[in-house]
Amino acid sequence: YPVDGIHFDDYFYPNLDDSKAETWFDYPEYQASGTSLSVAAWRRNNVNELVRGVYSAVKSIRPQALFGISPEGYLQNLRKDTRQFTDVDAWMTQSGYVDYLMPQIYWGFEAKQNGQAAGYAFANCLNEWVTLKKKGNVKLYVGLALYKTGTDAVDGNEVPEWQRYHDIMK
């Protein structure tokens, strides 16, 4: 049957906290490519080509179908060279990649890190995504983790906000 769209959920490239590129699983392919790009730029380009290819395939089969991705919600992590090689800036601002992005903003409004408001707190993340959205025509939807409601205790507070506020999802 005709589908309404294709959605990549939990798009994550293998997280490579090791900054030594020669230890990465795809380093031999990188060397064989003969590119002048850095390993990080090469990987980001490979991901961009994959995303652009899927978008093109979806549109060639059913032009009205949508294609979207749910990347991590914290833009600072997405933009690091040893993390996920996700070029959401290009995806959001250039045509031919996605119809929408749905960042997984799964942190609370009062998330803390080292006793301070965390950069990844919900409002901070949302504001960064909205700012990026203003630079392009791609739709922005926010992914929420309802399965964490009432159970998530990793917001850095003694009592999670899900338990402190009864109207948080209103």
Name each model-derived stretch.
Residues 1-97, 104-107:
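Polysaccharide-binding and catalytic clefts of secreted carbohydrate-active enzymes
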Residues 15-18, 77-79, 109-120, 150-156:
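Extracytoplasmic/secreted cell-surface and envelope-processing proteins
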Residues 20, 59, 80, 112, ...:
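Context-gated lysine
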Residues 34, 64-78, 126-166:
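Active-site clefts of carbohydrate-active enzymes
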Residues 36-47, 80, 114-118, 122, ...:
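Residue-level preference for long, well-ordered alpha-helices that form the structural scaffold
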Residues 52, 78-92, 117-133, 164-168:
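Alpha-helical scaffolding within the catalytic cores
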Residues 98-111, 117, 121, 125, ...:
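Loop/turn-rich, solvent-exposed surfaces of beta-rich toroidal or solenoidal domains
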Residues 99, 169-170:
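Extended low-complexity acidic/polar segments
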